[in-house]
């Protein structure tokens, strides 16, 4: 699993690659005869580059978590990268996936994801658990909790989820 955690301000430098500037500077300072400071050994591979590289075990799974937290320009870049399953590192060229990754996008619906991106995905809504499932989750996470308190707590959470709230509560 390769995970790309999305956040506001995410860009290609933090999602595809960065150059190890310190190592490049040391190589130049040492004069070790390194002609190319943009060699792959100075490349820090981020999630999207890792996802398009060959993997001996077959196509990797790329989790792009909370895509709704990014901005429109990054979403447009991502749309292009996922349509061709390739990324470009200007100093090294185009790196194209031999086996396209299996991509999973998650969203908390803090904003609408662009239609062009949604058209390229299978959409599956995961609703909040019912009372019994919430109880299973709570007792699995807190087996030492008292049953009476757990019942009251889960009932309270279930009631809150019926209210008109911007963000509904979970149990995490």
Please report, for each region that a protein language model flagged, where it lies by residue.
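C-terminal regulatory/interaction module of P-loop NTP-utilizing enzymes
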Residues: 1-172
């Amino acid at each position: 699993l390769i995970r790309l955690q999305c956040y506001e301000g995410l860009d290609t430098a933090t999602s595809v690659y960065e150059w190890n500037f310190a190592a490049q500077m040391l190589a130049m300072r040492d004069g070790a005869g390194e002609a190319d400071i943009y060699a792959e050994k100075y490349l820090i591979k981020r999630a999207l580059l890792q996802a398009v590289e060959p993997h001996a075990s077959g196509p990797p799974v790329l989790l792009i978590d909370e895509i709704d937290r990014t901005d429109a320009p990054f979403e447009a870049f991502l749309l292009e990268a996922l349509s061709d399953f390739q990324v470009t590192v200007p100093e090294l060229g185009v790196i194209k996936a031999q086996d396209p990754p299996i991509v999973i996008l998650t969203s908390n619906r803090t904003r609408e994801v662009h239609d062009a991106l949604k058209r390229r995905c299978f959409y599956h809504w995961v609703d909040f658990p019912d009372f019994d499932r919430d109880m299973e989750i709570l007792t699995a996470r807190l087996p030492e909790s008292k049953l009476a308190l757990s019942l009251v707590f889960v009932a309270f959470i279930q009631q809150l989820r019926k209210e008109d709230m911007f963000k509904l509560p979970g149990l995490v």
